[in-house]
Amino acid sequence: MEGDLSGFNIDAPRWDQCTFLGRVKHFFNITDPRTVFASEQELDWAKAVVEKSRMGLVPPGTQMEQLLYAKKLYDSAFHPDTGEKMNVIGRMSFQVPGGMLITGFMLQFYRTMPAVIFWQWVNQSFNALVNYTNRNAASPTSVRQMALSYFTATTTAVATAVGMNMWTKRAPPLVGRWVPFAAVAAANCVNIPMMRQQELIQGICVKDRNQNELGHSQRAAAVGIAQVVISRITMAAPGMILLPVIMERLERLHLMKKVKVMHAPLQVLLCGCFLLFMVPVACGLFPQECELSVSYLEPELRDTIKAKYGEQVLFVYFNKGL
């Protein structure tokens, strides 16, 4: 489809972000694992196209499909706050290939203590990078904070896994298979708030509908971080809860007993199937651009906004991160 696209608003969402289904479609688009394989030249091209489109300088003959593809690549690889290119492993589009490998091996190698400790460490290293990459970039994070967050989350995950492994020794085998999920959930409750503690201490930047900065709110930061924690646990839950049940049944089959070497690859593949759908679903649970009533903000910030804008500003907006 060709035509004059100079007035096309490339930043306008293709799907309604006020609805869950619209957000899921949006994240299906930008978390597409295939975008991980886009070359640096393609990503630079996408950024150039998006920036030119924002200025109304779309080259004549450009097709709508090209603009939409450029925006897809841009959203998958560049940070929404800074516009900087994100590292490949930390992108949400890498959640499927990266997550399926780590989750599959966590679920497969859960019996021995060294394996539990190693794979929980690998998982928390991956999570720490993802959390940092997808943070709200308006709130800087120091190296000390990142190191403390990483150490605390890894310790929490390993302690939970080791403790529950010891506790479930006499429990049915299926219960032991759920230990990795308990460790992941516990670590997410620590890792994300710790990685973004600066937002909880100093507040997150909140804006009005026209993107004018209004101040910093700790309450808004707490809401955004809580939503991210819920999303991350939701992302992992179906695969890490249902897959052990599936594998428990499959491993009883005569064929599976003969090809034990295929158990790990099968778990990795099935994890990928779960994550392919759960990454966009979990990311779409809450709007990325959060809306919060002014009445919920801290009294000082609320009074400042009302004194300056009166009743014109009833809601504030902020990027909660992913």
UniProtKB/Swiss-Prot annotation:
Q: What is the lineage of its organism?
A: Eukaryota, Metazoa, Chordata, Craniata, Vertebrata
Residues modified to N-acetylmethionine: M1
Species name: Mus musculus
Question: Would the keyword Membrane be found if you checked this record's keyword annotation?
Answer: yes
Question: Which reaction does this enzyme catalyse, per its entry?
Answer: L-serine(in) = L-serine(out)
User: What residue intervals traverse the membrane?
Assistant: 99-119, 147-167, 174-194, 223-243, 266-286
Q: Which family does it belong to?
A: Belongs to the sideroflexin family.
What are the record keywords, sorted?
Acetylation, Amino-acid transport, Membrane, Mitochondrion, Mitochondrion inner membrane, Mitochondrion outer membrane, Transmembrane, Transmembrane helix, Transport
Please identify the protein, giving its name as recorded: Sideroflexin-2
Please give the GO cellular component terms listed in this UniProt entry.
mitochondrial inner membrane; mitochondrial outer membrane; mitochondrion
Q: List the NCBIfam families.
A: mtc
Predominant location of this chain? mitochondrion
* Stored InterPro entries: Mtc (IPR004686)
**One GO MF term attached to the UniProt entry:** monoatomic ion transmembrane transporter activity
Q: Which PANTHER family match?
A: SIDEROFLEXIN, SIDEROFLEXIN-2
Q: Where found, per UniProt?
A: Mitochondrion inner membrane; Mitochondrion outer membrane
Which GO biological-process labels does this protein carry?
A: amino acid transport; mitochondrial transmembrane transport
